[in-house]
């Protein structure tokens, strides 16, 4: 994450205030170095130790930092106050400095443009992992959650493609769909309100123009819209009735999908498409066995996945394996032998019909059917041939 220190705040400052100070430090010119962040941390320790109270917007102004002791920290504080005063988010001068906790929630520092300086760099996988690790323990949509993403965006100046990659990495499919819906609506409203001298329709949409190397204010505007859409979509999903609809243990997938469709049709606001949101919701709220089956059909389209759920019955309950043979009821009397299959032709021993050769009555006694194959004598069997016995 560049030269930024840990997002965890030191003692004596709230997480929101610390993230705002880090964002303000990123606006220094020339860019901040590790020593600037060390000075900022030492200033917070000094303030908390000398003032005996946490650092806040009202008590920690530029004049609270002794000149020449903490490097460029006064510039960081001045930039923070200037940005918040322009946005109207800082507390008024009449606010008491000794305000007991809980403190009023501070304003979120917006993303501002730094001219045409090319600061963009694509996020590496390690950086995406760091961002996800920083926000996974924070409440989605909270100020600290938003500010952490703001700081990451301010450091890398991401393009729309980079932000889409980040959304896919940190959000679930349901959150991604809801975020894209909110972002599309926000971009349409911004394009209608932006003057033509700033956003030229002939050059492309806001998304296309903000991807250019020297987009400047347009890219900052897109980044703010992306964050705003993320916060709105998370709040909408958390408060909607369909967020609690899950498939019952004995409920068929068809009934579950129908219940979800009815809830979406009744509760989605006007202008929000239902179909893009239906498939990820179904995949997330299905039972584990059915969800695994659907993930196995990953090669199909989203509509085919949802339609394929109609072929899946209710989840199967685990049962003991059936025996290979189940004995039937005992019949009175001796057990009857199985009927024998009739022979296909006459016996090859006695040339008579009606029995198999193995059951031939002449097998043990009687003349052989033909001459001995060894000595050609027709009066004895091969086993009784004297020639065979003399050889043995």
Curated annotation (Swiss-Prot):
Renumbered residue ranges of the record's region Disordered: 327-346, 361-392
Q: Where is this site: Cleavage?
A: 109-110, 323-324
Q: Where does the record place Pro residues bias? A: 329-346
Give residues with lipid attachment (N-myristoyl glycine).
Answer: 2
What Pfam families does this protein map onto? Answer: Gag_p19 (PF02228), Gag_p24 (PF00607), zf-CCHC (PF00098)
Zinc finger feature spans (CCHC-type) = 345-362, 370-387
Q: Which UniProt keywords apply?
A: Capsid protein, Host-virus interaction, Lipoprotein, Metal-binding, Myristate, Phosphoprotein, Repeat, Viral budding, Viral budding via the host ESCRT complexes, Viral matrix protein, Viral nucleoprotein, Viral release from host cell, Virion, Zinc, Zinc-finger
**One GO cellular component term noted in the UniProt record for this chain:** viral nucleocapsid
Q: What Gene Ontology molecular-function terms does this entry list?
A: nucleic acid binding; structural constituent of virion; zinc ion binding
Query: Is Phosphoprotein set as a keyword in this record?
Result: yes
Q: Where is the composition biased (Basic and acidic residues)?
A: 377-386
Its domain of life reads: Viruses
- Motif PPXY motif, per the record, lies over 100-103
InterPro entries assigned to the protein according to its UniProt record, in alphabetical order = D_retro_matrix, Primate_lentivir_Gag_pol-like, Retrov_capsid_C, Retrov_capsid_N, Retrovr_matrix, Znf_CCHC, Znf_CCHC_sf
One GO biological process term is: viral translational frameshifting
Identify the stretches annotated as sequence repeats.
342-362, 367-387
- Protein name (Swiss-Prot/TrEMBL): Gag polyprotein
Source organism lineage?
Answer: Viruses, Riboviria, Pararnavirae, Artverviricota, Revtraviricetes
The encoding gene = gag
């Amino acid at each position: 994450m560049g030269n930024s220190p840990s997002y965890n705040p030191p003692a004596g400052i709230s997480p929101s205030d610390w993230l705002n100070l880090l964002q303000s430090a990123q606006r220094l010119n020339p860019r901040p170095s590790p020593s600037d962040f060390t000075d900022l941390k030492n200033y917070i320790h000094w303030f908390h130790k000398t003032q005996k109270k946490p650092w806040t917007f009202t008590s920690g102004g530029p004049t609270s930092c002794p000149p020449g002791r903490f490097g460029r920290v006064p510039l960081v504080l001045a930039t923070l106050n200037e940005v918040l005063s322009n946005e109207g988010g800082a507390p008024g001068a009449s606010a008491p400095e000794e305000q007991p906790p809980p403190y009023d929630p501070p304003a979120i520092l917006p993303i501002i443009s730094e001219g045409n300086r090319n600061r963009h760099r694509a996020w590496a996988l390690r950086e995406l992992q760091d961002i996800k690790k920083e926000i996974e323990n924070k409440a989605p949509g909270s100020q600290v959650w938003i500010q952490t993403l703001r700081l990451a965006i301010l450091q890398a100046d991401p393009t729309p493609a980079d932000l889409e990659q980040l959304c896919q990495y940190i959000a679930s499919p349901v959150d991604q769909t809801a975020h894209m819906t909110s972002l599309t609506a926000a971009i349409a409203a911004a394009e209608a309100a932006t003057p033509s001298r700033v956003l030229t329709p002939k050059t492309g949409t806001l998304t296309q123009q903000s991807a250019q190397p020297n987009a400047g204010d347009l890219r900052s505007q897109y980044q703010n819209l992306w964050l705003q859409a993320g916060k709105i979509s998370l709040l909408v999903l958390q408060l909607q009735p369909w967020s609690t609809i899950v498939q019952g243990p004995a409920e068929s997938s068809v009934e579950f999908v129908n219940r979800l469709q009815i809830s979406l049709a009744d509760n989605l606001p006007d202008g929000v498409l239902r179909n893009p949101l239906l498939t990820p919701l179904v995949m997330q709220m299905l039972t584990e066995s059915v969800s695994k089956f659907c993930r196995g059909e990953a090669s199909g389209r989203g509509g085919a996945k949802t339609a394929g759920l109609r072929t899946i019955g209710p989840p199967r309950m685990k049962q003991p394996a059936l025996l290979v043979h189940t004995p039937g009821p005992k019949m009175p009397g001796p057990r009857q032998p199985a009927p024998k299959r009739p022979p296909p032709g006459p016996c090859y021993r006695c040339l008579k019909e009606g029995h198999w050769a193995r059951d031939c009555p002449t097998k043990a006694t009687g003349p052989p059917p033909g001459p001995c194959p060894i000595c050609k004598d027709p009066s004895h069997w091969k086993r009784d041939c004297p020639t065979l016995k003399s050889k043995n």
